[in-house]
From Swiss-Prot:
The protein, known as: Pre-mRNA-splicing factor slt11
Species lineage: Eukaryota, Fungi, Dikarya, Ascomycota, Pezizomycotina
Ranges for domain RRM: 237-310
Family, as annotated: Belongs to the SLT11 family.
Record organism: Emericella nidulans (strain FGSC A4 / ATCC 38163 / CBS 112.46 / NRRL 194 / M139) (Aspergillus nidulans)
Cellular localization per UniProt: Nucleus
Any matching Pfam family: STL11_N
Cellular component GO terms, alphabetical: post-mRNA release spliceosomal complex; Prp19 complex; U2-type catalytic step 1 spliceosome; U2-type catalytic step 2 spliceosome
Family annotation (SUPFAM superfamilies): RNA-binding domain, RBD
Chain's role: Involved in pre-mRNA splicing. Facilitates the cooperative formation of U2/U6 helix II in association with stem II in the spliceosome. Binds to RNA.
Keywords: mRNA processing, mRNA splicing, Nucleus, RNA-binding, Spliceosome
BP-aspect Gene Ontology terms: mRNA processing; RNA splicing
Gene3D superfamilies: 3.30.70.330
């Protein structure tokens, strides 16, 4: 019988554990996580010793996460085994060690790394060792790390909100404007065309190299009554939404329009920057169109809302098609002069009255055909 792994002297330093040391960001919200354990599945990226790998998924659509370093190195570095970020501040360990001035040359060869990890493994299990060095660091450096961990991108508030209140006057509830950070929990400012390309230079023209204000597009024009009033066809229960940006998810549109009624389907095309909102009932579509009044803002993205128009695929009657054809001919004929129109009509009438003088030969096979079998020969 071959010897066990722990009985082998060369394998006695390999790590075996039943639970990983992972931060909350790497774990899903569900407290019941299914993990796959593989003993000695890979070598640690720091000490190069074989260790136990744990694999799991945050949800069904997420990628599979796994541990990258062994538990001993994770406890020595006070970091997560998966993302390798500091457990106290959530920062990279390189930034943390530079701020705490704990950067020291470690072992370079693989043998020395294994010896270093094995030497500190027993000390960590007893509650002493390199972990105590983090408690002896400077408090100012730890405060710097806290500010780095809680920092967010810079966002400048509007000037009227930064001005102090004069004469002790307080603003009413109607004048109060709440502006939250665009990177926080609340929604940010509404995106406009000026915020994307900057303020245009004053000048003439329709924009471009000469500067000036460009001509507004159809999405910037005010909505008309045809966009708000329901169409005459009672079978139309769809709304056509334009202005959909690439970062506006489909579930945000669904949660915004589902409050007016049950949705039959929602078709969103980020490539075409539009979406179709198909309601199950006509009353729900009318309520949504009445509430939006041709415009809507979803997660800071301005949208244009109008009624959907079905495309007629050759389902008109013959009389209706001939009527449209006559209207087209009449519209073209009214553009010319009256004399030229009269001459053209007269010439056409004379040509129609001329009888056909050319005899056309009948097609082959139209006459009586005589076969040899019919003659009896």
């Amino acid at each position: 019988m071959p010897p066990q792994i722990k009985q082998d002297l060369n394998r006695s330093g390999w790590e075996t554990t039943d639970f990983p040391s992972v931060c909350e960001n790497c774990l899903p919200e569900n407290p019941y996580v299914q993990m796959l354990k593989e003993d000695y599945g890979a070598e640690c990226k720091i000490c190069t010793r074989p260790f136990t790998i744990f694999r799991w998924k945050a949800d069904r659509t997420a990628r599979t996460k796994r541990t990258n370093i062994c538990l001993t190195c994770a406890r020595l570095k006070n970091c997560c085994q998966c993302c390798m970020l500091d457990l106290s501040f959530g920062l990279p360990i390189v930034v943390r060690d530079a701020a705490l001035k704990m950067v020291a040359p470690g072992p370079q060869s693989s043998i020395n790394r294994e010896y270093y990890a094995q030497g500190h493994e027993k000390e960590i299990e007893e509650g002493r060792g390199a972990v105590e060095e983090y408690e002896k660091t400077d408090e100012k450096a730890r405060e710097l790390l806290r500010r780095l961990a809680n920092s967010e991108p810079y966002y400048r508030k509007p000037r009227q909100l930064e001005a102090p209140e004069e004469d002790g006057e307080t603003q009413g509830p109607s004048d109060a404007t709440v502006v939250r950070s665009r990177y926080g929990n609340g929604p940010g400012p509404v995106r406009t065309s000026e915020s994307r390309r900057g303020t245009p230079l004053p000048g003439r023209g329709r924009g471009g190299v000469r500067g000036g204000r460009p001509f507004p597009g159809t999405a910037q024009l005010p909505p008309s009554q045809a966009d708000i009033l329901p169409p005459a066809d009672p079978n139309i229960t769809s709304l056509f939404v334009t202005g959909v940006e690439d970062d506006l998810p489909e579930h945000a549109l669904r949660s915004f329009f589902v409050q007016f009624g049950q949705l039959r389907s929602l078709v969103c095309s980020h490539r075409a920057h539009c979406a179709f909102i198909n309601y199950a009932a006509r009353e729900s579509a009318e309520a949504a169109a009445k509430h939006c009044q041709g415009k809507a803002v979803v997660q800071g993205c301005p949208l244009r809302v109008r009624w959907g128009k079905p495309k007629a695929l050759d389902n008109m009657d013959r009389e209706e098609r001939l009527k449209y054809a006559r209207e087209g001919r009449q519209a073209v004929g009214s553009l010319g002069n009256a004399d030229q129109g009269t001459k053209a009509i007269t010439a056409g009438t004379e040509k129609e009255q001329i009888p056909r003088q050319v005899a056309v030969a009948p097609p082959p096979g139209s006459g009586e055909v005589q076969y040899s079998s019919m003659s009896g020969d």
